[in-house]
Amino acid sequence: MLGNFRFDDMVEKLSRRVAGRTSRRGAIGRLGTVLAGAALVPLLPVDRRGRVSRANAAGPAEGVDPRAKWQPQDNDIQACDYWRHCSIDGNICDCSGGSLTNCPPGTKLATASWVASCYNPTDGQSYLIAYRDCCGYNVSGRCPCLNTEGELPVYRPEFANDIIWCFGAEDDAMTYHCTISPIVGKAS
């Protein structure tokens, strides 16, 4: 009981001293500034590209190519390991009546795309691929692929393959069907 009394006295003296030296408006203003600043911190841009090596600490040893596990081929365009499909997340349109560059008949091409740099083993060059979704029919279910080579999290949407990009398709065709992978140009 005696310990509580001393603590109460100490808190009372401290609070009276603070109240005597500061104004209420100033304290409330500072508190508001701190709270507003803390609320805005999540809105700051984040770029964690430098942390990828630390995130893959158990990955390949130094001097070993981290992309060595991805072995692209240039023969079967309907296979997930075809070189253009290095970052595709969805169904390959070539299996659904389309091609690498054209949507199947009856589907609509989404206006938005995500990009990746894919290595062609035949000519030893890397190419920029602009993946675009074909929309309007239900998911084909043929040739599903989940490749994440070069993918970045959703806060970098131009490099994220987890987003369904059908929101920009004609005629409100919002249902995902498959993905095409046209070449934009050589990656430098």
From Swiss-Prot:
Residues 1-57 form the signal peptide. Uses a protein-derived tryptophan tryptophylquinone (TTQ) cofactor. One of its GO terms (molecular function) is methylamine dehydrogenase (amicyanin) activity. GO terms for biological process: amine metabolic process. Disulfide bonds join C80-C145, C86-C118, C93-C178, C95-C143, C103-C134, C135-C166. Keywords: Disulfide bond, Electron transport, Oxidoreductase, Periplasm, Signal, Transport, TTQ. Heterotetramer of two light and two heavy chains. This is Methylamine dehydrogenase light chain. It comes from Paracoccus versutus (Thiobacillus versutus). The lineage of its organism: Bacteria, Pseudomonadati, Pseudomonadota, Alphaproteobacteria, Rhodobacterales.
